[in-house]
Amino acid sequence: MEPLGNRRPCSVCITKNRNCPRFCEYAEYFPYELQSQYESANELFGTPNIITMMQHAPEEKKQMLATSIIMEGNAWTEDPISGGFGMIQKLMWKIMLHKAYLRELQEKIKEEKEKKPASSLY
């Protein structure tokens, strides 16, 4: 982690309205640049719960956890009814539509190949 002199306070310290220590353990995961996204996660989970989750996570999983917390907060901001599940449903629907479109294109290609005589293919 970098010294505070070279960075702004992290999102966790801003939310808790405290001075960000020189080597804050949350600065790496929730930097100042993610403040607006962190606010969404804070509304969903609350900073005390986020801190508890981060403290209990193994070191190698903390970055993944922080990313998941931010993404889940964003999902609920975007879709307050369904959250992350709603986003997954939308993505699955898009995949189904694209697969159907791909099948349609493959059938058209097959039809065009069948229309042309074999000698014109080369």
UniProtKB/Swiss-Prot annotation:
Residues 8-109 form the LOB domain. It holds the Pfam family LOB. Disulfide bonds: none annotated. It comes from the Eukaryota. Belongs to the LOB domain-containing protein family. PANTHER family: LOB DOMAIN-CONTAINING PROTEIN 4-RELATED, LOB DOMAIN-CONTAINING PROTEIN 5-RELATED. This is LOB domain-containing protein 5.
